[in-house]
Design a protein with these regions (language model features):
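Non-catalytic substrate-recognition and accessory regions of acyl/acetyltransferase enzymes
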Residues: 1-144
Length: 144
């Protein structure tokens, strides 16, 4: 995939129905082809953990690659939500986990497009659960 096409992945996000937008805690959902995805920004002590999940029947869910064929609109929607969150909340630290190595490139692109321009620097750390991105605000004044 060429780089221009790669960046266009971000251009068509779906609308998110936000159930909670309270301070640093945001929770919402969006649907693609009758499948529901949840997105959550869990904020504690200046650190925000980001997760998104394909909801399955009987409350089973999947945080990994789901094989639904919807990865492009899912990623575009999540990436734009991260951009909106950083713009409005500007947490000191934002973290998320790439459980599959194939997702690392996508997450780097998301950070470079939506988080780095807001004054964050990021690292990638190996954990027992996957690779964790940790983006740290350079300074409180770097927000805009």
């Amino acid at each position: 995939m060429n780089f221009k096409l790669f960046l266009e992945l971000f251009d068509n996000p779906l609308p998110i129905q936000w159930q909670i937008k309270s301070g640093g805690h945001w929770a919402g959902s969006f649907k693609i082809n009758r499948k529901e995805y949840d997105i959550d920004f869990d904020h504690h002590d200046g650190v925000t953990d980001v997760s998104f999940t394909l909801m399955k029947p009987k409350s089973l869910s999947s945080h990994g690659i789901t094989g639904t064929g919807d990865e492009i609109p899912v990623f575009a929607t999540v990436a734009n939500a991260v951009g909106e969150y950083v713009e409005k909340v500007y947490p000191r630290i934002i973290k998320f986990l790439a459980k599959e190595p194939s997702r690392v490139r996508l997450y780097r692109a998301m950070l470079d497009r939506y988080v780095k321009p807001k004054g964050y620097r990021y690292t990638l750390e190996d954990t027992m659960f996957g690779q964790e991105f940790v983006a740290i605000a350079s300074s409180p004044l770097a927000k805009r």
